[in-house]
Amino acid sequence: MRQINRQSTPKVTDGKVQKKNNPEWTASYYDTPQPALVIDRQRPGKGYRHFLLQRDIETFIGLLPDWAELSKGLNAIVLAPGERTLNGWHTPGVVGVCAWETDLWIDYAESHFDNHQDVLARLGVHSHPIENGVMCRFTDTQVRAYQLLHILLHELGHHHDRMTTKSKVRASRGEPYAEAYALRYEAVIWERYQEAFGGL
């Protein structure tokens, strides 16, 4: 095999050592306001799958009655890699919906199921008790509906919480506010959702 000599040190030009790497900070939607909303679909990770497409997000946000107000300060919606204990997340300017497990049968703790029983019933998700929890059997369309109508709305609730505080730095009202926000808007857009995405 032929050996190639590579220069590993930077050049000297006009008596000045040149920088080896680009020192400029690369802007991203995490730290720089974007001219338009970015919908970023990342790899789901091993054992996970994205049931949402970018066009699903675009269609869904078109159903929200106050999107112009809600989208202020929102740079991106991320279809993020899956995590065992996380359905979604928010950080200033960005909300994420995590990929779903490839297995559509999900075990929930009884407390989690009780808190989401109305949403799951509306979506027609079948469930039965198991030891230490409840087994929920989703279909592809039910996963998509749950991620849009509950998880995304919940994370947008955190964003709305942050943007309606005086400082606009952090979401101060926490989980109860985001959960109530999701439940309120799910009821408002339920019929529009069914018209746009079809039945479950």
Predicted regions and their residues:
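Hydrophobic, Leu/Ile/Phe/Ala-enriched alpha-helical segments that form helix-helix packing faces
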Residues: 60-68, 156, 185-189
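Post-HExxH zinc-binding segment in Zn-dependent metallohydrolases
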Residues: 171-200
